[in-house]
Amino acid sequence: MTLNLCVLTPNRIVWDSDVKEIILSTNSGQVGILPNHAPLAMALDIGILRIRLNDQWLTMALMGGFARIGNNEITVLVNDAEKGSDIDPQEAQQTLEIAEANLKEAKGKRQTIEANLALRRARTRVESINMIS
């Protein structure tokens, strides 16, 4: 038995295919979803979506949003998403280093919050690559 997973951003469909299992990063921790899961709606944090296709696991970096589960269908609406396999490791590492430097240089509450968010996004992208390496 499978689940239909659809991952959407405001600009595109990132994924629309059947999967065996997924693990989502929510605001209250990780949640695993298997076929016949109870209906559920949840807020998603910046984090990694793990997707199991048969015996293979894939990753996707999600930049926060919402998920709805019901009738073996999962709809994930996020601000942005990238498949781990599509992320350039060197570019992601450079972005992480820049985000770390920007956090150290941040002045004031607003700059610190924005720098922390950028750092979380950059870390998620790097972790998404490292999980598939």
From Swiss-Prot:
It is found in: Plastid, Chloroplast thylakoid membrane. The keyword Chloroplast applies. The keyword Nucleotide-binding does not apply. One of its GO terms (cellular component) is chloroplast thylakoid membrane. InterPro entries: ATP_synth_F1_dsu/esu, ATP_synth_F1_dsu/esu_N, ATP_synth_F1_esu_C, ATPsynth_dsu/esu_N. Signal peptide: none annotated. F-type ATPases have 2 components, CF(1) - the catalytic core - and CF(0) - the membrane proton channel. CF(1) has five subunits: alpha(3), beta(3), gamma(1), delta(1), epsilon(1). CF(0) has three main subunits: a, b and c. Produces ATP from ADP in the presence of a proton gradient across the membrane. Belongs to the ATPase epsilon chain family. HAMAP family: ATP_synth_epsil_bac. This is ATP synthase epsilon chain, chloroplastic. The gene is atpE.
